[in-house]
């Protein structure tokens, strides 16, 4: 029965899935220290660029990703410079 429910189950929205993945990734890397942080930043940058590229053409050098670790929480900061004329791939 679980096979059929997997096929016909309602899929989560991509934003919800992305948020869950980031939370898991940040929680996992929280204790990794500085060496793990650079790997985390590279992986996040790659995945975020893939998602952005689906919707709009953005220069990879114009995307800045930073993780700030505080007491009890981490903050992921993403700065994306989007061109004024959106050359999106969705045709909107």
UniProtKB/Swiss-Prot annotation:
Query: Which keywords does the record carry?
Result: Cell cycle, Cell division
Per the record's keyword annotation, is DNA-binding included, yes or no?
Answer: no
Q: Write down the Pfam families for this protein, in alphabetical order.
A: MinE (PF03776)
On the tree of life, the source organism's domain of life is Bacteria
Q: Would the keyword Cell division turn up in this protein's UniProt record?
A: yes
List the Gene3D superfamilies hit by this protein, alphabetically. Cell division topological specificity factor MinE
The Gene Ontology biological process annotation of the record reads: cell division; regulation of division septum assembly
NCBIfam families xref list: minE, PRK00296.1
Q: What family is this?
A: Belongs to the MinE family.
List, alphabetically, the HAMAP family matched: MinE
Q: What does this protein do?
A: Prevents the cell division inhibition by proteins MinC and MinD at internal division sites while permitting inhibition at polar sites. This ensures cell division at the proper site by restricting the formation of a division septum at the midpoint of the long axis of the cell.
Q: List the protein's name.
A: Cell division topological specificity factor
């Amino acid at each position: 029965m679980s096979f059929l429910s997997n096929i016909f189950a309602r899929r989560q929205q991509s934003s919800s899935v992305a948020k869950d993945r980031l939370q898991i990734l940040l929680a996992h890397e929280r204790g990794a220290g500085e060496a793990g942080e650079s790997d985390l930043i590279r992986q996040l940058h790659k995945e975020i660029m893939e998602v952005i590229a689906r919707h709009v053409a953005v220069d990879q050098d114009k995307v800045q990703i930073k993780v700030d670790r505080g007491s009890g929480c981490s903050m992921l900061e993403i700065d994306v410079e989007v061109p004024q004329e959106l050359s999106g791939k969705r045709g909107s």
